[in-house]
């Protein structure tokens, strides 16, 4: 019975111990959550040091020494904190049964220092654990009642030492439990206090560390910021100066503006670099920050010196920069970076007079070269096209910026104007039939003249083969005549004996193209002209041109000239003369030249339209000269007319349109040479070029060749002159076009370049519309534009609803001398409309679908990873 009783008693104790143990475990788990980062110890003696700081209090609270070992093996994973006190309580294990209170007090005292000692060792984990423990501390206080299970430790020794005096322990357990309860309460209180202390320590440590880091960063930032602020202040000053400079420069030279921009960029770069360094310093350790701060301070000091000190102080900092800066103060704009590269002349280290500190700082930053502002200003103007501009020395005060910039620029402009006056312009004469329009086209005669208009007295020179003109070299370079005179260009164009002159259009059967694009025609046959007289087949052959006569061509060999023959046929009007055109030719021995008795006189050049465009040739023969007149209509902006007079006599050529004189638009006259039935014929060619806006088509134009002895003052009696008149044709050919409205409800027929109001006929499908089936509007002849007829037909959709698929439209316009038409097919308007509707609907639906898909993709929940 005793044995059975003992078994029951032991069983009850075991159950009680198990219950107590489970309670303790629960409490321990709560505690362990707070110290999860501290311990991984599984043996009491080994890992106590690592996790003791935080968990030593619970160890101390378990007054029975037995509990010390108990928590070591069993709650290793959950309550690593108990392990901390293990080392101290190890010897207590033996006396656990006897002196529970004493050992408890002792161990508590001993363990606590250990915990405090270990706490610093725990670097990052300690603060974190402490922070977490604080939260758990409350739980500990709450479970203080459960802490009664501190006796839990009692059950653990049994597991650790199965051979222990189990019976004795069991007997003693009851008193122990009672005592433990009392002590446990105290221990619980102690635990809370200890835990709080540990937590406080950890928090303090963390705060201290953070404060230190923050302090360092703050210090660095403050230092850096100071330097940056200083630099920024300097930069601002420099930038302000540049802005002022830019304002002055903008009105003077574009290059100066660019320079100002460059200066600003340089200043900004410096500021940015300083900022970048400061950022790096902040990120780097404290040591690096200190070093960087020093550098920043130095920079700031330098900048401050440059800004505050006068020009002399800046010179001390950088000799070259100071010199340039000081000088640049005179003309802050013209100096700058871009100008220095342009001109390196006249470098002089002129010390500037007292200059504004701001200007000095800016100049030093912008200019990095030694040349004085003098050369800089010169270069700025040179950029404006003044290769020969003279450098101007600037030796003055800041207010000199405007003066320095303005003076060189004026010189430059004058230089440009002077060079422009020596520029020679060359034009060429070309006459070619226009078979399509029934009129002939022409280009300008070859004439070299200068821009400067002047009134020069006509001079009389001997017209000889040797002195007739200036001989050009092989490079086709034009010889510039003296100012106010016009050089006479002599060239030759020959035709076969069968060539005739008259009011007829010459149909070219063989056309030769000169290298500059002009054409000369030979073997021509006359054809009646239905509308207007044509140019004569006489035309000027440029130096590099080709004629049908086998002669030596100046500037080109005959072989080279013949290479172009036969490859091009009748191009109406050709192209305007190339830059090589207009070279003056010299008669060759194999060309027929006029007799030495023949003389000619130059007329003054009047490109801008003067009223003295008179070409004078010696005395008029008793018979009247042959004169031909043609008008070119191929150019869109200008009407060109050419008048050719066969004569070796002195003549003056005048122009009239209607009753108004248009000599102001005379492009000048040239001498040319023709071959008529194998006999050389000399002719005078005058060209007129008038903007179409000043000309009303279908007006009469007259060319008059008057003897020079009849020219008296401004009045000329054209009745005593040989005249030729013709009608100015329309600027272009008659053409007709049909257009459909965007809605497909109207068809419009427009015919332009009409001489008179024509007759129009509309056909829709196989039906011919009556006159009341369409509307028409007539626009009369205006300057530069012939008549325009606009006709409109309404498109009726009702007929299409019954299956008609398309409609074809024909517009025929018949004028007095021409007929044009246009034919267009209009698709079914309903089909077009339906197609557009379907296309728009499809596009809209597609876009909506794409938007929906995108929305679904963005809002779809994503799977979480556990």
UniProtKB/Swiss-Prot annotation:
The chain crosses the membrane at residues 835-855. Coiled coil: none annotated. The keyword tRNA-binding does not apply. Residues 443-463, 535-561 have a biased composition (Polar residues). Glycans are attached at residues 48, 518, 611, 659. Its main location: virion. It is found in: Virion membrane. Residues 24-185, 319-619 are annotated as: Disordered. This is Glycoprotein gp2. It comes from Equine herpesvirus 1 (strain V592).
């Amino acid at each position: 019975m005793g044995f059975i009783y003992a078994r029951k008693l032991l069983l009850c104790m075991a159950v009680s111990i198990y219950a107590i143990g489970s309670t303790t475990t629960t409490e321990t788990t709560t505690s362990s959550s707070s110290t999860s980062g501290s311990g991984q110890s599984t043996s009491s003696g080994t890992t106590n040091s690592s996790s003791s700081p935080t968990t030593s209090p619970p160890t101390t609270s378990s007054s029975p020494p037995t509990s010390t070992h108990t928590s070591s093996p069993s709650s290793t994973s959950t309550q690593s904190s108990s392990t901390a006190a293990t080392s101290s309580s190890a010897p207590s294990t033996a006396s656990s049964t006897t002196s529970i209170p004493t050992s408890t007090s002792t161990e508590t005292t001993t363990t606590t220092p250990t915990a405090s000692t270990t706490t610093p060792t725990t670097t990052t984990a300690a603060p974190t654990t402490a922070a977490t423990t604080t939260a758990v501390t409350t739980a500990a206080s709450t479970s203080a009642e459960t802490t009664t299970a501190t006796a839990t430790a009692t059950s653990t020794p049994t597991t650790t030492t199965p051979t222990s005096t189990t019976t004795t322990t069991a007997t003693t357990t009851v008193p122990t439990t009672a005592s433990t309860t009392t002590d446990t309460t105290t221990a619980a209180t102690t635990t809370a206090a200890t835990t709080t202390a540990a937590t406080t320590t950890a928090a303090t440590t963390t705060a201290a560390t953070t404060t230190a880091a923050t302090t360092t960063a703050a210090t660095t930032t403050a230092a850096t910021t100071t330097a940056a602020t200083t630099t920024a202040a300097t930069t601002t000053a420099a930038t302000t100066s540049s802005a002022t400079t830019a304002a002055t420069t903008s009105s003077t030279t574009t290059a100066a503006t660019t320079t100002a921009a460059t200066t600003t960029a340089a200043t900004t770069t410096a500021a940015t670099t300083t900022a970048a360094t400061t950022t790096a310093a902040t990120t780097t350790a404290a040591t690096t920050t200190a070093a960087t701060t020093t550098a920043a301070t130095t920079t700031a000091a330098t900048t401050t010196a440059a800004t505050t000190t006068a020009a002399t102080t800046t010179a001390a900092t950088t000799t070259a920069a100071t010199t340039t800066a000081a000088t640049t103060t005179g003309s802050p704009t013209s100096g700058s970076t871009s100008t220095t590269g342009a001109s390196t002349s006249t470098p002089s280290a002129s010390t500037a007079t007292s200059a504004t500190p701001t200007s000095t700082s800016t100049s030093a930053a912008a200019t990095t070269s030694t040349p004085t502002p003098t050369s800089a200003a010169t270069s700025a103007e040179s950029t404006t096209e003044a290769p020969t501009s003279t450098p101007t020395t600037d030796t003055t005060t800041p207010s000199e910026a405007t003066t320095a910039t303005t003076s060189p620029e004026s010189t430059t402009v004058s230089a440009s104007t002077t060079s422009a006056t020596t520029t020679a312009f060359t034009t060429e004469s070309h006459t070619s039939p226009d078979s399509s329009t029934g009129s002939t086209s022409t280009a300008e005669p070859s004439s070299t003249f200068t821009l400067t208009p002047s009134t020069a007295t006509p001079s009389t020179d001997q017209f000889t083969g040797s002195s007739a003109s200036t001989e050009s070299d092989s490079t086709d370079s034009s010889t510039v005549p003296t100012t106010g005179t016009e050089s006479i260009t002599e060239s030759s164009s020959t035709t076969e004996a069968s060539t005739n002159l008259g009011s007829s259009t010459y149909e070219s059967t063989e056309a030769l193209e000169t290298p500059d694009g002009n054409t000369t025609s030979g073997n021509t046959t006359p054809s009646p002209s239905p509308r207007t007289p044509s140019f004569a087949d006489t035309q000027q052959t440029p130096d590099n041109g080709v004629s049908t006569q086998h002669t030596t061509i100046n500037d080109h060999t005959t072989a080279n000239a013949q290479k172009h023959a036969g490859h091009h046929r009748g191009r109406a009007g050709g192209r305007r003369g190339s830059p090589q055109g207009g070279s003056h030719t010299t008669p060759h021995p194999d060309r027929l030249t006029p007799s030495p008795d023949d003389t000619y006189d130059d007329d003054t050049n009047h490109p801008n339209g003067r009223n003295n465009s008179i070409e004078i040739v010696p005395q008029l023969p008793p018979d009247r000269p042959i004169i031909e007149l043609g008008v070119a209509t191929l150019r869109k902006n200008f009407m060109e007319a050419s008048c050719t007079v066969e004569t070796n006599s002195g003549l003056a050529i005048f122009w009239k349109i209607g009753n108004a004189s248009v000599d102001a638009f005379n492009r000048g006259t040239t001498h040319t040479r023709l071959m008529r039935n194998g006999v050389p014929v000399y002719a005078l060619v005058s060209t007129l070029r008038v903007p179409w806006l000043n000309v009303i088509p279908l007006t009469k134009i007259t060319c008059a060749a008057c003897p020079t002895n009849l020219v008296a003052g401004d009045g000329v009696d054209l009745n005593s002159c040989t005249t030729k008149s013709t009608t100015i044709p329309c600027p272009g050919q008659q053409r007709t076009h049909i257009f459909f409205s965007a809605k497909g409800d109207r068809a419009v027929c427009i015919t332009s370049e009409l001489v008179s109001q024509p007759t129009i006929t509309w056909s829709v499908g196989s039906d011919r519309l009556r006159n009341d089936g369409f509307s028409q509007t007539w626009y009369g002849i205006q300057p530069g534009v012939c008549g325009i007829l606009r006709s409109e037909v309404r498109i009726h959709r009702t007929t299409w609803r019954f299956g008609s698929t398309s409609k074809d439209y024909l517009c025929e316009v018949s004028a007095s001398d021409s007929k044009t038409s246009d034919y267009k097919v209009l698709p079914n308007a309903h089909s077009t409309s339906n197609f557009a509707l379907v296309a728009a609907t499809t596009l809209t639906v597609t876009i909506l679908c794409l938007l929906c898909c995108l929305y679904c993709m963005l809002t779809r929940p994503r799977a979480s990873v556990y």
